[in-house]
Amino acid sequence: MGLDVRNNGNDNVEIRAAETRTAQRADEALETAADFAGQPKVTHTMRTINRTLSRRISRNTGSEQVLNLRRLMEKYLEDTRFKDDFIFVAVDPNQYSVPYPTLVVMSGAKVGDHNHFFGYVLPLVAGLAPLPRREEQGPHGNILVPRTWVDNLNGTFINEVMAAMYAAIGGKSNGTARIAGLAVVTNEITAESAHLATTLLSAADNAIQTAIEIRLGDKLGLPQFNLGMMASDQPISSVQYNTSGMQDSDIVGNPVRSDITVTISNRIRQAMSDYDSQQRLVATTGYIDLTYSPQNPTFNQGPVLVNGYPVPPTVQYQPRYVMTSAYPLELDAFTPNTFVLGLIGTIATLNSGMAWAQSLISNAARGIGPHNPGALAMVLDPEVTAPLDLSTQTNEQIYKFLQQVLYPSLLISIDVPEEGEYSWLLRMIPAAEKIYTGKVEGEVREISEGYKALYRAFDDVTLGCFSKKYQYGLPLVYATGNRIPLGHYNHQDGHRHDIRDMDDLYMMNITNPDTVEAWEDSFDRTDMTMSQRVVARHEIIDRVLSGSWEQTGWAMRYDFDPLALQALIEAAADAGFTIRPENIQHLAGTAVRGNMAARARGLGNISGNIYARSDRPNVGVNNMGGAFNLF
């Protein structure tokens, strides 16, 4: 990689308190990090005491886990040509003001005479007690807001981690350091954790290499993925509707709701052969949720039109596809452009003949249960007091039933984890929500880096066709103002399930109308602060599950602008990209790729409450500091 500075005294496998720094160097590096991150300098009393009264072996067992993880990663790299490309930096709570023992995996690239280092941060929290709730003042009294480990990873944490990174490379004069990504490790790390260590190292390398492409790609001449790399008549999309109850999992084994999995593959024609092979490129997972959206009952207006046709007056719910994860399959790299490929495939596939509705039909086939759409019968007829069993109905009959209560358009949303394997990449979604920075030069407002990154990815992937259809500066995503708890509970099938199983249909089937209304208000009541809605949602989950669930993190939910998605799909088609859908059951005629976006656009004009954005500040949102943001 041509870097001048590698471990710089941090090569020894054993982790000792003064291994890579003197007290003076650590303080100087900390000040450098604070300047670089734009964060205030802070006093580090605990670190100073521990440094004065230090011992060669720490009582903090987390240090042993950091050592185990580092050893396993170094062992994996021993026989590779990349073993000298990585720096492993231990950030010990006894030496730095960090809440958890942390390992930073560093690597980078050289541009001219300057070294650029990027670090992937792995806080280890196994065995630690949950954080106590934070008291927050609300308009009607104080509330206790739930917290998870990520809530401690604030600007001070970033400063301290960067201080350790700068100390490891010998200071700012030897290069620039940035944080490429962060994933909290909840697993206990032992000598037997080789597979997990390799997985984490792979995630770190992916994040670092993508950070290099984002920050330095133009200077280094690095290639970017686009649709021109795929033969126009070969891409294949397939969709799987999860009927087994088994769910995907994230990098540390937490379940991820995956009712729907969309996979994009490239069909590779074999010369002199009677068969073709497929290379699976990228996949997305998610589920269909419902958002209450009545037809303007307070106004005397005509019938609601979707795609030029009136919808039945009984229609009250907007279907929403919530993307819970996106990840590469047989690709090693995951970049903004390959994410956009997955997004294109997901939109086109689920909109193919309203294929998204098949997920609800699959749930109906299971009969009475927590996600049975037969509960919508109580919406259609007040005299119906219990969910209907639709398992004996045909698919066509169930679909006609759904048409009576659901809008025919699909809202596309994504949950962006505040930390996790690919949170560093998905952070371009919230970064893109803020279109302008607030700076004005002349009469031109400055566009934010996040917006530039997402718009550029849309345009690059479609070979420049997106910019011909969608004006630069128009919205790409909207913040819903909802902080979504991530975690798991023990399902009756004996497996751990994603806490996002708790959705509108779940509440309709398991609880009562008052709880359903309170649940919907916890997402849509813009007169409540985000913290108030989070607390209300937590209280409902606690009641339904009798408190037997564990929260592991947070995600922020964003909606994609339907006009931007329509332009993206049309741009992909103009770029010569055509998808061959496989194992998809059409429920609404032939597949017309642009119809979903057109229907959703019409719906957006008459039901603005779909985008439930609060005008109140998002108090309590984790702020990872400027150094963490690639965009």
UniProtKB/Swiss-Prot annotation:
Q: Which UniProt keywords apply?
A: Host cytoplasm
State any GO CC term.
Answer: host cell cytoplasm
Tell me the compartments it is located in. Answer: Host cytoplasm
Q: What is its main location?
A: host cell
Stated role: Self-assembles to form a proteinaceous shell that encloses the viral DNA and compartmentalizes proteins and DNA during viral infection. This micrometer-scale compartment contains narrow pores and is the site of viral replication, with the proteins involved in DNA replication localized inside. Provides a surface for docking of capsids during packaging. Probably protects the viral genome against host defenses.
Subunit structure of this chain's protein: Homotetramer. The tetrameric protomers further assemble as a square grid.
Provide the protein name.
Chimallin
Q: Which organism is it from?
A: Escherichia phage vB_EcoM_Goslar
Q: What lineage does UniProt assign to this protein's organism?
A: Viruses, Duplodnaviria, Heunggongvirae, Uroviricota, Caudoviricetes
